Regions:
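Secreted/periplasmic carbohydrate-active enzymes, especially glycoside hydrolases
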Residues: 1-146, 150-154
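Active-site-adjacent "subsite" loops/lids of carbohydrate-active enzymes
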Residues: 97, 161-171
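Solvent-exposed loop/turn segments at secondary-structure junctions
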Residues: 138-140, 160-163
């Protein structure tokens, strides 16, 4: 199969500023899933944080196929500081102020409307929280989208406490 052109673009989510735009030649594309790796440098990109939730759109176009994904540049890690485990967001220590979200939604009991999802995130921010926990539930995409937009971290509790830890070990 001959090479095709792929256009890769990174731009501000709610702006017009384009941080990166380049056309690549991709070969051996087949029907179904294809994986390609590209390393790009974006020195003008701003990090996402709970105080400044900068978001970007990554767009990929090959022929008539287009895909766009919103994202933020961030990394979360746990560091050992003199025997004390501490959380870091983008290399800076963060103290997590959180509460449980039971995800009981009055409209239907299963999934939140966009209005309720946004209200939950806004309420958490007004209370001074920087994180919520999805408790005994899987996070809904509209809740996570608003959390990204408004600067709120989410933790999804893994559940499964009915099984002993040995059930998950490879040994």
């Amino acid at each position: 199969m001959k090479a095709q052109k792929m256009l890769l673009t990174v731009k501000e989510h709610k702006g017009e500023k384009v941080l990166y735009r380049k056309e690549y030649s991709v070969e051996n594309l087949v029907v179904g899933e294809n994986k390609q790796t590209f390393h790009i440098h974006l020195p003008a990109a701003k990090l996402w944080s709970t105080d400044s939730p900068h978001l970007y759109d990554l767009s990929v176009s090959v022929g008539t196929d287009n895909y766009t994904q919103r994202f933020g540049f961030r990394w979360f890690e746990v560091k050992d500081i003199h025997g004390d485990k501490q959380f870091f967001l983008n290399g800076k220590r963060i103290v997590l102020r959180t509460a449980i979200s039971w995800s009981f939604w009055p409209d239907n009991g299963i999934t939140p409307s966009d209005e309720l999802a946004r209200r939950q995130v806004e309420s958490a921010k007004k209370l001074g929280l920087n994180m919520l926990n999805f408790h005994r539930t899987i996070g809904h995409s509209n809740v996570l989208d608003y959390a990204d937009e408004l600067g709120l971290l989410y933790f999804e509790e893994p559940g499964g406490n009915q099984y002993p830890i040995s059930h998950f070990n490879d040994n």
